[in-house]
Amino acid sequence: MTHPSAPRARSNGKEPEKEEPRCVHPDLTPLNVKDLDNKSSSAITNENVSSPTLLPFTERLSAIQPQIPNLLALKEPENGKNKHPDSEQDDGDMKEQRSKNLSPESDDPLLDHRHLQPGDTVSLLSHKATLQMYRDNAKKTNDPMLSYELAVFMLDVSRSLEFSQQMLSRGQDPAAESEQLAKEAMSILRRLADRGHVESQYLAGDCCMNGYGMSKGRPDLGLAYSYFVQAGKRGHPDAAYRAGTCYEKGWGCRRDPAKAVQFYKMAASRKHPGAQYRLGTAELNGELGLKRLAREGVKWLKRSAENATPEFPHALHELALLHEKGIYNVLFVDNEYSCELLAQAVEMGYAPSAYKLGVNYEYGRMGCPQDSGLSIHMYNIAAQQNHKEACFALTSWYLVGVPGILPQSDTEAYLWAKRAAEQGLAKAEYACGYFCENGIGTPRDLGEAKGWYQRAVEHGDNRASSRLNTLSGYTAKPVGIAADEASAKNLPQAIPVQPLSAPFPSAAPISTMRTLGVANYPTPKTMKETQAMQRDLHQQALVAAIEEREKPKTATPTSPQGPSFFGQKGSQGRPSEKPFSPSQPPKEGGKPMSLIAAGPRAGFPKPPTPPPPPPPEPEPDADAQLAANPKSFKSRLLRLGKMGKIRKGAASEGAEGEDAENVAGLEVPEGEEPLSATEKVPDGNEAPKSAPNADADKETGLNKDPAGVGEGAPSPKPETGAMVLSGPKPLGQARGQPPALTPGPSGPSSAAGADGAPRLPGEPKQHTLGDSSKPEAADKMSQEATEKSKDVNNEKSKNKKSEKSGGLSFFGLGKKIMNKGSDKPGSEDKKNQEVPKPSDEASPSIAKPTDTPAPLSPRPDEKNSSLVERSKDSESTSPSSPKPTTGSAEPSVPPMPAMPPSTVVRPSPSMALVPGRLPAIGAPDRTESNPVPASPQIGGIVPSRPPPPGVRPVMPGTMMTSRPFPPGARPGMPPNAQPGARPGMPPNAQPGARPGMPPNAQPGLRPGMPPNVQPGARPGMPPNVQPGARPGMPPNAQPGARPGMPPNAQPGLRPGMPPNAQPGLRPGMPPNVQPGARPGMPPNVQPGARPGMPPNAQPDTLSGLPLNVNAPEANNMLQLHPSAASGVRPPAALQPSLRPGPRPFSPTFPSPAGPSRPNPHLLPGVSSSSDGATPRANGHGVKPGSPPSMPEQHSFAPPAMQPGRPPSPSSPFGRPPTGPFSPSAVRMPRMPSQSSMHQSGNGPSPPKPGQMMNVSLPARTNQPHLGGASPRPPRPTSPPPFLTSQQPNRPPVPRGVMPPGSGPSMRPPQPPAIIPPPPRSPPARVNQPSLGPPGSSMPQGRMDMPSGPTAQGQSPLSKAMVSPPKMSSPDRPPFAPPTHVTPPKTPAKASGFSTPDSSSSKIMEFKDAESDNLNFGSATTTENAAAVGEDKSVRKKWLGFL
């Protein structure tokens, strides 16, 4: 490698010294000198270089990479780089190619100064020399890019002169020189902008906007706006964005949001992130005249985030905030993606995003881990950009410090708070005032503190006002930016401190790691060592505390439910009421050892210490208790086999020494203490001293013990897991057999294990901790003690019958409370004491204990000794005391009545209870708040008293909280009820039965059903009916049959059809008719023919009247169409009116005036299909003046209930009307209003000339001209003639009238003169009982004919005169619907039944079934009428019961 200072070889007679300044100049060091030297050395090897001066310059141009991409930064072509300098032609080609890239006026490569660009390469030459070179080039050439480059360089120099005053001053004013350079650059830019140079226009507009290079430094917004608009229209994205900003803010122009949006979209289309962000926020907030569209706004924000730059990272931050909360149906919540967007913005240096991430890392939000180091780092990035919230956050961190990351410094905390307060943060101003008032991080200055408090009050901090009151006597000093500027040289500068050992790259220079606080900070190494020592000491303290707590424990785990559940010695380590947690490490030498042994240094904060937990409870010293009373403790544990009595006596004698007689069960004279000091129960559980009577026994044995639960507890409620002692030993248990496991309130316990642990039969006995004697010695001592106590116990058993002393025993084994209150368990105490029971009659089966049961007492170190003390108030029954007495301290309290045997739980075969003998239930005393616990799994009883008010009775062997019934039973049930039964059910009811059902009812039945009914049947059905049958069907009907069908009918048939009919036929058709025929047609008619046609007629032929009209058809036609020659005229109100209505109507729904007000202009017809209704119930009308009833489902009314259709005589709807006239559809001439109505499209097509018009009444309204909305399809018509019987008083039918069931196409054209015009009369209301003459049997028109079932032998109108209609009667028929002028479209159906081709057949059946109408939209047969009435009465009966 050739050194740059080495001399060069001669070339073309030129000295190499002339080239030395170009190659050895010290300012060339930033360039790649290695590449230059290598290339120049390669050129030196060739002596035939024609132009040596071009080679270093050419290679240099190819090596320099421009810093700012613009049009001046043109790279050399590839052929120019790789040309070898040997040939002259190659060098000429290179010069020619380079001249093309330069200005056309100059071919001299020396004039190309593209390597002299503003930025880092400016230092290659001095400013003065570089400016001179640029000026020379600009004068010699007219290239706009070179002039633009000169202007840019001048602006950069003018700005950098402020920071290099000492370098360029030399007697000149740098400010004046800078202003002169700026003005010169601005003149060049304006000249280029006028010539149309886009870059110059934008840069000139920016200078005018900032006032740079302008006269007096004032901005010219109008000139800037014009330059921005010109450049923006030429496609400059930044200029378009700035032009949109001018239009939005009104800078240099009038505000025009539409123009602003136009320029923003122009810039956004060229991927300008600022314009895209502004459009996104405008769409989200509905600004700039745009609609508020969140989806479009999010789209613009996403595009801006994709094109984000360090100058415009705002979209990343906003999009992250949107993902944090989400936008409904637009943007979902994604915390992880939100943090990722924030991190991208932080990489671009966006301060708000850095602060947001700092908060997340400090508090662990948005899925970020809680990291102090990262939080401080993010706060530092934001604080370097003077983010006020981040500066104040650093104040908080400096106040507490982070070991190993950030040292604690009050000075740094004050400086950062001051920086935040200078930017107007109210809480930072208050903090600065507090620091100055108390001298934290700064000298105490109350005047300055008052000044900060005043600024905080001005910015809305209410806490500063109270502080100002305390500083009323001081003068506030000026604080803030003004005071800092005045004394900027005297105040220290806030230098951010780089966190120590931070898990992130350094964001501050190394020189800024020095702090301004106390100089005696601990080093990171010292801090780590101190923290390690603290952790070790704390760990050692915890380990020592755990070992101390687990000393009395063994390897056997302790049960949380009981002291002796897991095995031997488990009760010794029974956990106390409060868990043990040491508040400090063990003491050494009587002084507590501090956790921070090293101690904090000056400036090092103490670590925050947790609040001290409550002091631990002292653990009972089992060894001391066993040493003080080892024999007595062991005697209460060894109780197995026939030697239990001897062992107990020997242990009692060895336990007390001189008091052995008292312990063995001897009488103690009054005034003597039966127990020694060492015999007392620990933890304050003392045995009662004396109990001369029941009252004294209650005071000493029950109320005196204050520590039933724990130490110092006032309530005698037993602790969880306490041992439970209960009544006598069950039958069948040998004396040597261990008692069964007895679960206490929290778990089972045993009476036969050492240390209270359960021991199964046959398990060897265990020795407990502290046993100083062997079993052999214990047996020997027991024998001696037993021999001494035999006579005394036998004498005492004779006098004990009259004494009242209560106590609990474990199968008859346990301590006895003597009349003096001594704790003396005797071998024959079971014979000498009476056990109070409810009554002998109530519990005759209580098992009597054996002759010599071994006593049982709990361990003295257990805290549940209060249970034993309280259990002494009741004693199990002995053979010598057959008469029971109550164990209550108050003899006046009666015992609780005995519960039935079903309430006694028998979980094991060891429980033996005679069926007639039951345990008593009650509480130990009315004055106690907690009962005596007992075991529910022992066969004995717990003598007790009735429970106090508000307390549940106690089951034997259970806590007070347990229920006095078996586990499967519920409260409020009898004792002998089964577990699955519910309250309110008889005891012998089955578990699956429901309340309110008889005991012998089957489980699947429902209330209100007879016991012998099948489970699948429904309420209201006879017992012998099949499960699949429905209500109203005979019992022998098949499951698939429908109501109203005979029992032997096939399942596929429909109601109203004979049993032998074919399944495909429809109702009302004879059995021998063909399946394709329609109802109402003779059997031999063709399938395609329609009703009313002769059998030999063609299906589509329009003929006159049928030729073979038989008597039934004539009767049916006579019923619906009376002749004028009969002499019988209908009432005036029922005569049709030829006056048309004011407007066509379509009464689909009832009018608002009422559901049953027909239009008086028209008569009811057979083709009614609207939802009008007549207020009929049970076959009677409405009283005069009564309001109309509420309409029911009128569209589902059966055809037999339509106006103008009488019911069949065989149907249960009632007898046929007795009147001679039945109003029906009459043939009327076609009126103009009718034709206009049909043409309007609201009704069906008009009938052909000569056909009959069926006119029916609509719903009655106050306005006769108003009708419904749209017509409904016509309803099925009356039954065919062959299913209706001959009715009297029927005039012959005229030949000109068609049956109502015939379709419109089958009606033969008849001259209108055949039907005589009815007399004109004023229209009157129908559906009123007053229309007919009083006392007459003629109904008020067929519209009001009853269509529901009536009582047999009762006229349809007989009941209507005395009772109003019922709104919810079960047998109320649907109202007869009003009709409109519609020719019938469906043929007549037999018996009025709905057919499959009717749209409402299924709905009609469903509706009738819901309204308890057993007719299912039709008239039932005569043979089923009685069954229907009977079934309805049965249902009424059951409904009344429910």
From Swiss-Prot:
Protein name stated in the entry: Chitin synthase regulator SKT5
Membrane topology: Lipid-anchor
InterPro entries: Chitin_Synth_Reg, Sel1-like, TPR-like_helical_dom_sf
Residue spans of biased composition, Basic and acidic residues class: 12-25, 75-99, 762-804, 821-840, 859-875
Domain of life: Eukaryota
Start and stop residues of the Sel1-like repeats: 198-236, 237-272, 273-309, 313-350, 351-387, 388-425, 426-461
Purpose: Activator of the chitin synthase CHS3 which polymerizes chitin, a structural polymer of the fungal cell wall.
Compositional bias per record (Polar residues), positions renumbered to this chain: 39-53, 1232-1243, 1392-1402
Biased composition (Low complexity): 747-758, 876-891, 1295-1305
Gene Ontology cellular-component annotations: plasma membrane
Alphabetical keyword list: Cell membrane, Lipoprotein, Membrane, Repeat
Region of interest called Disordered, as start-end residue ranges on this chain: 1-54, 72-117, 550-1402
Sequence ranges of Basic residues compositional bias: 633-648
Family as reported in the entry's similarity comment: Belongs to the SKT5 family.
Sequence ranges of Pro residues compositional bias: 605-617, 964-977, 1139-1158, 1200-1220, 1271-1282, 1306-1322, 1371-1386
SUPFAM superfamilies xrefs: HCP-like
Location of the protein in the cell: Cell membrane
